[in-house]
Amino acid sequence: MNKFLTALLFALALLCFGCGGQQGASADGKMQVAASFYPMAEFARAVGGDRVAVYTMIGDGIEPHDWEPSARDLTRLAKAKVFVYNGGVEPWAQPAVAAVADDGVQAVEAGQAFMQQLDKSDPHFWLSPRKAAVEVAAVHDAFVKADPEHAAEYKQNAAAYIAKINALDEKLMAVAQNAKIKNFITTHAAFGHLAADYGLRQESIMGLSPQAEPSPAALNKLLGVMQADGIKYVFFETLVSPRIAETIAQAAGAETLVLDPLEGLSEAGRQNGDDYLKIMERNIENLNIALNGK
């Protein structure tokens, strides 16, 4: 965290000289919104529509768990009207929020309700459609507070987007109810909330950190689970090397599929027009394949 503190002090020094411009508004009058990483930015754009200018602090193709902001990042954050973050994924967020509080930045921890109720070690709430809808509602509430003049638009946008998330919920519920196999193998334990909300069980290769290395005993246990339950697929994700997933799949005579934790878009995904809803659709399709041993 020394790197973060150095950047924080430098950014605060820059702010003392004044940044210029209207706080929280872009040149075209849109409300400036900072989002910590991809799903938070997606939710902010969905709720804000044409009334907001959203920028993502953690760029495309970057794994967010170990990212830390630079002085430039913090200086830009201080110009935002609203800062949207998940909670749990961004250990730097709360110190940053405290640092820019005097600049009028309104922070919303989209997953706050779940951070208070559930195991804080797994903050991947956005991967369960049911919890994602709650996070979108939290973003809506923050925007209405920051910009009450356009509350009706934010309400309409949020309702429309939540309806689309609810459609994902219905599809996933149907897949889970009809599944022949109730557990699945993932690279890292990002899908615990999805599994819990839909009556499934996640078995992870590398725990909550996508960079962790599994022990030989853990690998043997996973192979045993796969054999006992007839699991024919091992999921890997887009921003982390598939090497270990491929090794386990080969040892078990299984195949690999993508289960995207949506922590960031790849460049290819951005060019293809991917978004949260489309990627979650593919996740559900791949879960259907894996849970039925197709």
Predicted regions and their residues:
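Short, low-complexity disordered leader/linker segments with a strong preference
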Residues: M1-K30
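Extracytoplasmic metal-acquisition and chelation regions
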Residues: C19-K294
